[in-house]
Every structure is written in C-alpha cells, then in structure tokens.
C-alpha cells in the first residue's frame, strides 16, 4: 500500500474588512438628517463610542439611543417632540430649532440641543391657545395671524381633541369680536367667515356685528345703519341703496351685515363724467343721471375692444370693386372732354 501525499498550501492573511455604509456614518455630521425624523422612526448613526453616548443623548433628548450591532453600531429612535408653542406656532415654516443658552437658531452650533415641532402643528389645534393670545398683543405678525385664522376653517384633523380645540377657538373669537370687531384678529376672523360662505358663518357675522357699540356702528357701519334721511331718499330709486350710497361703496366689506353685502354684490356700478355749464334748480326740481344706460340697444356697459370694432366695421362695409371704379372714372373723364 502506498502512503498518502500531503501538500502544504501557502498561508495568506485574510483580506481587510470592508466597512458597510452604516459603519461609515458619523453622528456629528448628521444634524440635518436626524432632526426631521418622524415619531417612532429609527435613524442609524453608525459606530458610537461609550464616552460619546451621554453627549449624543443630551443633544437629542427627544430620541432614545438604541444598539443595532457589533462595534458600537447605534441608532436613534424618535419618542417625542419638545418644541414649545411660542417657538413653533408663530411661524408656518419651522419644523425644528436648536436651543443654546436660552436662544434658538435654525442652524446647529456646538452645545445646542434639538427641539422639534409637532408635524402639522397648526392643523391639530395645538397652536390655538398661544396664537389667540399672541395675536392680540403688540408684537404679533399680522400675516401669521391671518393665515392661522384662515387655516382654522380648513383643518383636516378630525380627532376629538382637534374638534374641541376648534369649537373653543370659535367661542373665544365670537366673545372677543362681539366687544370690538376692529381688532385686527377679529377683522381677519370676519373676512374668513365671509369666505367660508355658509348659513352658520353668515349668522355668526351678523351676530358679532349687531353686538358692536353705537360708536363702532357710527364709524364703520353707516351702510348697515343708515340715517332716516338716507332711508327716505332710497324710496325714490328702484335699485338697492347699496348701489348708490357712498357709505356702502366706500365701506369696509368686513363690517357689512350679510344683507348689505349681498345687495352690494348685485350692483353694476358705472362711472361716468358729466359736464354742466349752468344749472338752476329749486325745491320742486329733480335731477337724475343714468349715463345713457337705460337703452340697452344703444349703449353697452362692456368695455370697448378697439380691434373687434375695426374688424366689425370692415366685415359690414360694402365690397370695393376696383374694376368698376376704373370704368366710372374713364366715363367721367370722357363726359368732361365732350362737354368742353
């Protein structure tokens, strides 16, 4: 029997390990990646040394640090949103901010702590209490308040909490604005009630405006509360008073009762110029200018389109027959020669 043959293979060191994408992550360069994470979402942050764990936890208190693999591989799991109402509600563009020494910034700086705003924070009603107070103060942004009031009429949040917040807001706005509708937040509320255009919103508008003081009505609502003389004068005209009364055409439409607002919308206001050289009138005289619009066949309220007018005239003019004109010209010349 022959003996076996053994072959000794050369020895080689194993190839160096190739790091995975997760192993190449650096938590110190991921501020803008971690901040937008949604609730219960994991964000992998790569290997994390033990001595850096406390620093990361302090920087991201809304997250829980989770071990995901060997070599210190870790991830952050979002558990909460710690942003405050004054910092999140008084703008529509902020999703998070960094806080350091009592000051906030949209950009990270060393030593800052992340505070995030609830997604769709305005839509959920979480801003109603803060903005209701802020929009009555001295430092409010009128555009922000106007946008917030408008968004309240179009909220998609249908939870019990969200609906109750909306009801509370409407009740507080009605109470506040019934006392003085000239407050900017109240004028915005009336504007959006009008745009909402439901029977309930119209009733609320009229209720609020009828509660105003006599001084308010005299200053802002003279169209809705005309004088006796103005009412007697209105009996002379067929069209609604809102169409010719300057107190209506020049009024702030937010302070018109629904009846007056609707009548004003039916008016066809035409401006015309009148020149009078000499006019003598007594108590029995009357004067009324209609701008010639009573005869619809002769006058039109539609703006004149010059191009269309020219095209219309060409279309309805007689056709020019050049050869006939030439013959007539020769005939006239021949008659003149014979006559001479």
Swiss-Prot record:
Residues covered by region (Disordered): 1-20
Compartments in which it is found: Virion membrane
Post-translational modification: Unglycosylated because produced in viral factories instead of the classic ER -Golgi route.
Induction: Expressed in the late phase of the viral replicative cycle.
Gene Ontology cellular component terms for the protein in this record: membrane; viral envelope; virion membrane
Virion surface topological segments: 2-319
BP-aspect Gene Ontology terms: fusion of virus membrane with host plasma membrane; symbiont entry into host cell
Keyword list, A-Z: Fusion of virus membrane with host cell membrane, Fusion of virus membrane with host membrane, Late protein, Lipoprotein, Membrane, Myristate, Signal-anchor, Transmembrane, Transmembrane helix, Viral envelope protein, Viral penetration into host cytoplasm, Virion, Virus entry into host cell
Residue intervals passing through the bilayer: 320-340
Membrane-topology descriptor: Single-pass type II membrane protein
Pfam families recorded: Pox_G9-A16 (PF03003)
Record lipid sites (N-myristoyl glycine): 2
Family according to the record: Belongs to the orthopoxvirus OPG086 family.
Described purpose of this protein according to its UniProt entry: Component of the entry fusion complex (EFC), which consists of 11 proteins. During cell infection, this complex mediates entry of the virion core into the host cytoplasm by a two-step mechanism consisting of lipid mixing of the viral and cellular membranes and subsequent pore formation.
Subunit structure: Interacts with OPG143. Component of the entry fusion complex (EFC) composed of OPG053, OPG076, OPG086, OPG094, OPG095, OPG099, OPG107, OPG143, OPG104, OPG147 and OPG155. Except for OPG095 and OPG053, each of the EFC proteins is required for assembly or stability of the complex.
Protein name as it appears in the record: Entry-fusion complex protein OPG094
The organism of origin for this protein: Vaccinia virus (strain Tian Tan)
